[in-house]
From Swiss-Prot:
The entry's keywords: Stress response
High-level lineage: Eukaryota, Amoebozoa, Evosea, Eumycetozoa, Dictyostelia
Family classification: Belongs to the small heat shock protein (HSP20) family.
InterPro entries (UniProt xref): A-crystallin/Hsp20_dom (IPR002068), HSP20-like_chaperone (IPR008978)
Range of residues in the leader sequence: none
Pfam families: HSP20 (PF00011)
Protein name: Small heat shock protein hspJ
Domain of life of the native organism: Eukaryota
Record domain sHSP: where: 52-161
């Protein structure tokens, strides 16, 4: 065979092979970029969860005492609603708690669930409180709890058996 026949065929073969190599390389780079984008989306969701307002889950409390009652005001984070908040008394402790479950799903159908929980416990022993009189109101993200004091100043007649 002569060089004049082999050389053009070899050049064609190399050119075709180079085109295929470049196409494969471009395809691999595109796949890597897509994987990186998916990974970044998941990382962004996780970071938003981690960097969420954890400090807001520990709201400020303001406790005021009057001669007849105690009033406790708790600033609850904006993302909680009334149905997610509870107020209980157990073992001479006032327990204010809130719980929320938030579900995320992105375009790739990746699902994540975020839980937010807040709980504040206040010792109310030795306060002479009438626990049956507790009232709670939630308005403008402020939970106001009113507990009346027991009245020992009234005279109570006790029957003798």
């Amino acid at each position: 065979m002569s060089c004049s026949i082999i050389l053009p065929n070899l050049i064609n073969f190399i050119n075709n092979d180079n085109n295929n190599i470049f196409e494969k390389n471009n395809e691999i780079q595109k796949q890597q970029q897509e994987e990186e984008n998916k990974s970044n989306q998941v990382n962004n969701i996780l970071n938003s969860i981690i960097e969420s307002k954890f400090t807001s889950l520990n709201p400020k409390l303001k406790i005021q005492e009057t001669p007849n009652q105690y009033q406790i005001k708790a600033l609850i984070p904006l993302n909680f609603n009334k149905e997610e908040i509870s107020v209980n008394v157990k073992n001479n402790r006032l327990i204010i708690s809130a719980f929320k479950e938030i579900k995320f799903e992105n375009q790739e159908k990746t699902k994540l669930t975020k839980f937010e929980k807040y709980q504040k416990t206040i010792n109310v022993s030795n306060k002479n409180l009438d626990f049956s009189s507790i009232k709670a109101q939630f308005k403008d993200n402020t939970l106001t709890i009113t507990i009346f004091k027991q009245s020992f100043e009234k005279e109570i007649k006790i029957n003798i058996e």
